[in-house]
A protein has these predicted regions:
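Hydrophobic N-terminal alpha-helices or hydrophobic patches in metabolic proteins across all domains
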Residues: 17-139
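N-terminal first-folded block
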Residues: 45-51, 143-144, 168-171, 175-178
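Unchanged
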Residues: 174-261
């Protein structure tokens, strides 16, 4: 069966490879459903009042008719990105909800053109799914961070950190939290992970997109910042090590092409601004 084959494939894949540094998975055997296109037959349209549960539906909800194996434990699907009642909807699975006290899972489906991250989905299903009563995995993730530099003994040095969940050097970054904008997330993450306060340089914003093991579609936004703080205090629970390196050594320490491209752009920016001469 497709469900059993895909489930086995995902479990083997995740056992064989480490995920990106800030990706946390749950009920990994269902990850194969993320990104799939399904057809939903709506049984509880938007604004429907469920007398038994005493709730009014803020989203269309229904049964998944096609796109997944009949043996899968899917009990239904919420539809996001649609602001009116529909009878049938075809869209992409953007999240999987596993209720802690009930069997089976619930999908969250949206149009291909719509992108929602975890806290947006949590807010949308709050009318029926109370936070803390379920686990959730999402197709889309958004992280923000910063390339931080400072002048040490007359030389420009860049901050690299190594996360305990990754063997690779990178920049401080993390998931956006509810109510934050991109710069607020980047500021908080640098402060949490490195213990330093930063100032953002204007007109530098680098966005990259990639997938984690072909299942999670991630967007990362990186800013350029500097600091007057001279003491780096890493978050020991998450960060293993840090370094302040000159440009060439920092480039050699980075593994991923996206990170190298970001640092190269940041270095060019500083050269053009006359902040550094090498």
């Amino acid at each position: 069966m497709l469900y059993l084959q895909e489930r086995k494939k995902i479990c083997i894949m995740l056992d064989s490879f480490s995920l990106a540094s800030d990706f946390v998975g749950c009920f990994r055997e269902f990850l194969y459903m993320l990104g799939k296109y399904v057809r939903v037959r709506v049984t509880k349209p938007m604004h429907f009042f469920d007398k038994e549960k005493n709730i009014s539906y803020d989203l269309n909800f229904g049964n998944v008719e096609s796109g997944i194996d009949a043996l899968s434990p899917v009990k239904g699907a919420y539809i996001m990105g649609v602001t009116h009642r529909v009878r049938v909807f075809e869209g992409r699975v953007i999240a999987i909800i596993k209720r802690k006290d009930l069997g089976g899972i619930i999908l969250v489906v949206a149009p291909k053109s719509k992108r929602y991250i975890v806290h947006q989905i949590e807010d949308a299903v709050e009318f029926a799914e109370k936070r803390g009563t379920y686990d959730i995995n999402c197709l889309y993730e958004s992280s923000c961070g910063a390339i931080v530099y400072r002048i040490i003994n007359g030389e420009t040095r860049f901050l690299l950190i190594k996360n305990k969940r990754s063997a690779n050097w990178g920049f401080p970054k993390g998931h956006m939290e509810r109510g934050e904008n991109e710069k607020e997330t980047a500021y908080r993450e640098v402060l949490e992970e490195a213990g330093i306060r930063i100032r953002f340089l204007p007109d530098f914003r680098f966005r990259s997109e990639y997938s984690i093991q072909g299942r999670i579609e991630k967007q990362v936004v990186i800013f350029l910042a500097t600091t007057d703080d001279t003491t780096t205090i890493i978050q020991r629970e998450e960060i293993e090590e840090y370094l302040w390196l000159k440009f060439d050594k920092a480039m050699n320490s980075l593994k991923f092409p996206n990170d190298k491209q970001m640092l190269r752009k940041a270095h060019e920016y500083l050269l053009n601004a006359g902040v550094t001469n090498g």
